[in-house]
Amino acid sequence: MTSDQETRVLAMLSAFEAGKKISELDTASGSVSDMRIEVLDTDGESKVMNLSEAVTTAANAVCGRYWNESNSTYRAAGYHGSLDMLRKLPELLGLGCYLVQDDRTRRKLDPTNHYRFEDGTPAKLDGTMGQYMWCWNIGFYFAEWKVGNLKYYAVSLSPIKGKQCVYIPAGGLSALGGGVMDRTNNILCSVVSDAAQYRGGNNDASRDGTYRTQLGMVATNMQYRNFSTYARKRGEGWDANWYVAQAVVEILFMIIFGTRNMQEAVIAEKDSNGLYQGGLGSGTTNMPNWDQWGYYPVVPTSAGIELGDGCGETTFNVLKEDGSLHYAAKVPVFFGLKHPFGHIWKIVRGLIDNVGDEKSEVYVAPSLYAGYDDNSISGLIKVCEVPRTSGYIKQKSYYLLCAMPTEIGATASTYFCDYFWENSASSKGLRVRLSGASALWHVCGGVCYAYEQCGLVFVCVCVRSPLLFRCGSGDVGLKRKRKTERGKERSLKFCIESFGKAVRRVSELAVRRVDFCDFFAGFG
């Protein structure tokens, strides 16, 4: 060892011996907002962080994904916020299938077997024990923002600091991806049954017993308003595919899987960070000669149940009249939700496109609970304008959860990968959105597909509308982090308790460096 090296070693030894344990340090007298701590960042390097911000971040976790819009890839460039929260987000939100009563009380089904409850007792999906629904079991906040060329989508259980957020109460929609009609009582359901009372399609009994049977299928061929009317007969909080639910599926898929392309191939393994990757496969989007079935449903409501609350795809074989195979239909499943895209179009309620001479303006209803007159835009909220030309979607707006395209110019393998269809040049007036495409639309028919050509009295054999419910009440609106008096009391109580825990935790550590995650591990 050289003399210079020896001098430096002695200096380090002297500094080490002069160091103090945290419990031996003088009590700080400055403002918490001015204090800083050393943290170990995700890149493994030591960084500095404001103490007050660190406490807030630990208490109000947020997670999301971001896309670099300087390139056209549909895959996220990275994750935002808490990696651990992102890993656990499906569990945290309670994503999966439940049996739901008309008063909206719900009981969780076994995540691997939907014919029994979580406690192991038998469950029936025929409506006798409740409606078979896919739910997010707790409310959450959503925000989107842009920094430079980076576009962020994030969720949290509390308002995201400094961002405009939309609060989404707990709710759910039909686990089947479509609604089933109780033909006896004229009420929209979500059940799995081959009984004539729940015959699908247009209720054509002449198809019973044939290869084109509509027994056990979702209902189609009804007017836009009727789906809603029959759903609302269940009571407060029920409707048919309210636009919020459509947005929830899109948002959560993008954030959890890190892709805007739901039709990307299924990848069973998680990535190196323990996050979901890939997509849900092609779905039921490329059936040949569908006209032989009259464009009615071909995949029964029982298909896909075997995956439980899983993600991926399963296969249902569509047979010809002679019993031979016609088409191996792929059924995509998103944490138990069947057909988030493909098979049969979904009509979206609560959202109107006003197609005028010069522009097409999109409006949303401010509340599911209030009266909604779809013959007028009076009382509705303008959220965006959509393109006046059809094409693949390059940009979308999620302002107030409208989930509508604002720019085209992509392809089937870039940006959002899905198509926007409109006909403003030849037709004007109020229009509704069809989403998810059908069994004919191939690669352009993913969850983000938007079809804006249908009037309010539109009826089609290939259009469905899933039953939906929402818990809580209140209007759609942006929220910033404003504390009520009660919220201030709760926040003050949390700060006192958390800071007390922090002090006790720090006093136990006889080290000069503190890992950020270790430091806050005991905060709760």
Predicted regions: what they are:
Residues 1-30, 480-482, 486, 495, ...:
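Short, intrinsically disordered N-terminal pre-domain segments
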Residues 128-130, 157-339:
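Short aromatic-cysteine micro-motif
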Residues 64, 247, 269-302, 344-353, ...:
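C-terminal, surface-exposed recognition/capping segments
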Residues 95-158:
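Extended, Lys/Arg-enriched charged tracts that mediate electrostatic binding to polyanionic substrates
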Residues 36-57:
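Short, surface-exposed terminal/edge motifs of secreted or surface/virion proteins that either
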Residues 515-518:
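Intrinsic-disorder-associated, low-complexity terminal segments enriched in Asp/Asn/His/Tyr and depleted
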Residues 41-45, 140-142, 178, 351-352, ...:
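Acidic glycine-/aspartate-rich tracts in secreted/extracellular proteins
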Residues 29-41, 336-338:
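Short hydrophobic/aromatic-rich beta-strand motifs
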